[in-house]
Amino acid sequence: MQSGRVIMIVGNGDVPEGAAATIDAADLVIRFNDCRSVGKGGSRTDIIAVCNTGRPALSMLGGGRWKTSAAVRQARELWSVRSGARFAAMRAALAGTHPDLDDFCDDYTAGFESFARATARKHRVIAAETHDRLERDLARFAPSPYVAPSSGLVVIADIVSSFAAAGDDVVLAGFGHIGWQWHPFAAERRYVDALAAQGRLRRLHPFASSDLPQGA
């Protein structure tokens, strides 16, 4: 019998058919950025993890659409995935290797913190140490050249390493491990598969009507 929480981490990739009710029945639902998973992936949103640097951050903060969306209105916490100081330290190297990413390290953490404070939400910045540890772990899975791990993987690493308690059931949906060319998605998939093999998380599969314990 499940003794802890069901923590559902819902990425912006394809969500299994029939998953909405299962996702919404979890004890905690974490979504990302513009929460494209809402709909087929249910509607419950407790935490939104945001990419707080570069163009995605500017897009979210720069207009009213994100701030007034149903998912954002429902969320009680915002998590900034990137350490501003860590990404600022990457700027000089990126200027040489990826000059097209000149705004990649622009830090908008203060904007998310201000928005959270104005709307009586908790704001949290995931520690730079989590990102550092994740990059060391990813090295075991032979990543192709990359700029940074995806926000989804940083949150997964944070949950399994420090946020989840013994007995919690960490479940992933909407993680296809495809997208931006400068995220190491093939290695990220292998990293997640290794965590699943260790029993530290599991993926939500289609038509899993019994994925949640009775009474959850």
From Swiss-Prot:
Organism domain of life: Bacteria
Family annotation (InterPro entries): GT29-like_sf
Physiological role: Involved in the expression of hydrogenase activity. May be a regulatory gene affecting the expression of the hydrogenase operon or could be involved in the process of nickel incorporation into the hydrogenase apoenzyme.
Protein name per UniProt: Urease operon 23 kDa accessory protein
Organism: Rhizobium meliloti (strain 1021)
Native organism taxonomy: Bacteria, Pseudomonadati, Pseudomonadota, Alphaproteobacteria, Hyphomicrobiales
